[in-house]
Regions:
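Glycine-rich loop(s) and the adjacent beta-strand/alpha-helix scaffold that form part
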Residues: 208-266, 431-448
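An anion/pyrophosphate-binding glycine-rich loop and adjacent beta-alpha core
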Residues: 242-374, 448-454
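Short beta-strand "acidic-cap" motif of Rossmann-like dinucleotide-binding folds
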Residues: 36-42, 246
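Glycine- and aromatic-enriched mobile tails/lids
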Residues: 3-6, 10-13, 22, 30, ...
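Conserved N-terminal glycine-rich FAD pyrophosphate-binding loop of Rossmann-like flavoproteins
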Residues: 44-77, 251-254, 262-266
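Conserved redox-cofactor binding core of oxidoreductases
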Residues: 101-200, 212, 256-260, 342-343
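Core beta-strand elements of the Rossmann-like FAD/NAD(P) dinucleotide-binding domain
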Residues: 10-13, 198-208, 410-411
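Short beta-strand to alpha-helix junction loop
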Residues: 86-99, 133-150, 173, 223-231, ...
Length: 665
């Protein structure tokens, strides 16, 4: 039982948003604009969310640089990048609504770079047919967070004038970690957690929760992710009864720093390649031309000369292979290093110095110039960077309704947006789609959470017993006199995931990973943290480990089950895509403490969307049965068009008669 001396701070809200990155802030703004009393829970300091690390830009088909761009082209690019495993409805909504979300952000005060005629500037990025990324130098994520924070402050000022308190309708709880979602039957009733500084417990009673907690990268040693990314939202959703989808798909960004060891994994923005940077191996060869897969061969240049012409004449030349989707580039770099053509630090060279004048590099890529000079003593205006793959993004996440963001499974009142949700990106995310994804689906999740609250006949109640259990679970590591060290456990977990569930996967290694994860589960159950509750990083990690472990098990199980290679999942023993597997989503749920894995059919794309693709392209992804359906659809459409034309001609009467008919009359 909970000690009577255990103090719990209690709050009542309509909507609780867990996560203060782009998705969380946009969801909170929407819930507050809908009139709901909203709490924002930030694991770190407010304004320090991992979104600030997103550098390149936000993808939106505004057509400011190339007027040929539109939502249909963006949709096609997103589906191609995800190898057609995307939830098509999410990809459609994203492509259609991203421009409006970017323009909206500008009305909030965002200061985007401009074209010469004053429009929002857009840059090239891997997998995007046209320049599409709205950007602020190479610090776009930072500007996005600054702008959304500014909007929240303006709402708080409005509340101060109307209600007498800045926190009356929207409040930020920073340096706060949520450890459990609390239920009333199958409905969300609240969230329980603690203040990281004091260790004091906090309880939010609320009928709706929006998860916006980001990714899982801290389960890997080499990662671009910040310390907060321990899979909290994924695990909270699982324990509450929601399902996770596509957890086998992890994106290893092709360009992370590899030297010095203390900064290995820190992101090197794709903007370097978008602005002309090229990849070379230790022999000086521009190697990406050797790695263009058949499914992309029509869109990418075959020679360096054509690739270089594309930057100034994209309408008459094909794209450089350095701008292939990230999964392709990461595998290529991995192969070069594995075959002995890597740099001394175990990466490859990324060269922008020979491609642009020094002043232009400093203007376009100020953060990269500062990062390499400060961390590696490398001047990128004079010498190439050493880069290699780094765990960057999880495509899998909470399975949600595409339109509302409501979680699937056995729980009601739970919503998810951003990286913690799954489906939008399929098997691989295109660069730039993340920031616009945050805005599109953050807005939708926040708005629909507010609608859900409005439609409730009565608010759910938090049971005393569930709070007591949450307290006991949180205190357990502190109450063990002996046990496993949390830092050792994290290192062991990272070794398992990095060595056995990394870029290249094999059946025996995945089976070994699951066996080792089972052993780690027993050890994590005995984790011990010395000291008290006041700012105790060992205790914090001990609690995070439970989340990291269950999410890692989902990834390993799904990776073992999917016997093909697609996007962010590469099986050396099944090296090609299998059209039959494209029709399958792998869905994880919890039965007690056991991860259950089920197969679920991928939703069929609507006719008007699948008709955006050529048959020759679809033949690379679809089964023969699906292609037959497509052919029948095309035939039916042609017949319908012919019938409609005949009907129109008949309705037009004599005016539609040809010259011969007129002569006969």
């Amino acid at each position: 039982m909970t000690s009577t001396t255990t103090r719990i701070e209690r709050h009542h809200y309509d909507v609780v948003v867990i996560g203060a990155g782009g998705a969380g802030l946009r969801a909170a703004i929407e819930a507050r604009l809908a009139g709901k009393k909203t709490a924002i829970i930030s694991k770190s300091l407010f304004g320090k969310a991992h979104t600030v690390m997103a550098e390149g830009g936000a993808a939106a088909a505004m057509g400011n640089v190339n007027s040929r761009d539109n939502w249909q082209v963006h949709f096609r690019d997103t589906m191609r990048g995800g190898k057609f495993l995307n939830n098509f409805r999410m990809a459609e909504l994203h492509a259609k609504e991203a421009p409006q979300r970017i323009w909206e952000l500008e009305t909030y005060g965002a200061l985007f770079d401009r074209t010469k005629d004053g429009k929002i500037s857009q840059r090239n990025f891997g997998g995007h047919e046209y320049p599409r990324l709205a950007h602020v130098g190479d610090r776009t994520g930072l500007e996005l967070i600054r702008t959304l924070q500014q909007k929240i402050v303006s709402l708080q000022q409005e509340d101060k004038r109307t209600h007498g308190s800045y926190d009356a309708r929207i409040r930020v709880f920073d340096e706060t970690t949520i450890t459990e979602l609390l239920l009333d039957g199958d409905r969300i009733a609240g969230a329980f957690g603690y203040y990281r500084e004091s260790g004091e417990f906090i309880l939010f009673e609320a009928p709706a929760v929006v998860l916006a907690t980001g990714g899982v990268g801290r389960s890997y040693k080499v990662t671009s992710n910040s310390w907060e990314y321990t899979g909290d939202g994924h695990a909270l959703a699982l324990r509450a009864g929601a399902t996770l989808i596509n957890m086998e798909f992890l994106q290893f960004h092709p360009t992370g720093m590899v030297w010095p060891p203390s900064v290995k994994g820190i992101l090197v923005t794709e903007s370097v390649r978008g602005d002309g940077g090229i990849l070379k191996n230790s022999e000086g060869k521009r190697f990406m031309f050797d790695y263009v897969p058949d499914v992309f061969r029509k869109q990418y240049a075959e020679t360096p000369e054509e690739a270089d012409r594309w930057y100034n004449d994209p309408d008459n030349n094909r794209r450089p292979p350095e701008l292939l989707p990230r999964d392709e580039v990461a595998r290529a770099i991995n192969t070069e290093v594995k075959e002995g053509r890597g740099t001394p630090a175990g990466g490859v060279y990324l060269d922008i110095a020979s491609r642009l004048p020094a002043d232009e590099i400093r203007r376009r890529l100020p953060s990269m110039h500062h990062q390499f000079k400060g961390l590696a003593d490398v001047d990128i205006t004079k010498e190439p960077m050493e880069v290699g793959p780094t765990c960057h993004y999880v495509m899998g996440g909470v399975e949600v309704d595409p339109d509302t963001g409501a979680a699937y499974g056995s729980v009601r009142g739970l919503f998810a947006a951003g990286e913690v949700s799954g489906g939008m990106h399929g098997s691989n995310r295109l660069g730039g789609n993340s920031l616009s994804d945050l805005l599109v689906f953050g807005k939708r999740a926040g708005g629909h959470a507010a609608t859900y609250v409005d439609q409730l006949p009565a608010r759910p109640r938090v049971a005393v017993a569930t709070v007591e259990t949450a307290v006991e679970t949180a205190l357990a590591p502190l109450q063990r006199d002996t046990g496993e060290n949390p830092y050792t456990l994290q290192q062991d977990l990272q070794a398992v995931m990095g060595d056995l569930v990394g870029i290249i996967r094999r059946e025996a290694e995945l089976a070994d990973a699951l066996s080792r994860l089972a052993e780690l589960r027993e050890r994590v159950a005995k984790v011990s943290a010395s000291g008290g509750r006041r700012y105790n990083p060992g205790w914090h990690l001990a609690l995070d480990l439970r989340n990291m472990l269950v999410v890692s098990e989902c990834t390993a199980k799904a990776a073992l089950e999917r016997r093909e290679s697609r996007g962010g999942h590469t099986r050396e023993d099944f090296p090609t895509m299998d059209p039959q597997w494209r029709r399958v989503n792998l869905v994880c749920s919890l039965e007690g403490d056991t991860v259950r894995l089920d197969r679920k059919p991928l939703p069929k794309m609507r006719a008007e969307l699948i008709n955006l693709f050529d048959r020759a392209e679809l033949a690379k992804y679809l089964t023969d049965e699906e292609l037959a359906e497509f052919d029948a659809l095309v035939t039916a459409d042609a017949a319908a068009a012919e019938a409609a034309a005949a009907t129109d001609a008949a309705a037009a009467g004599p005016t539609a008669a040809g010259p011969a008919e007129k002569e006969n009359r």
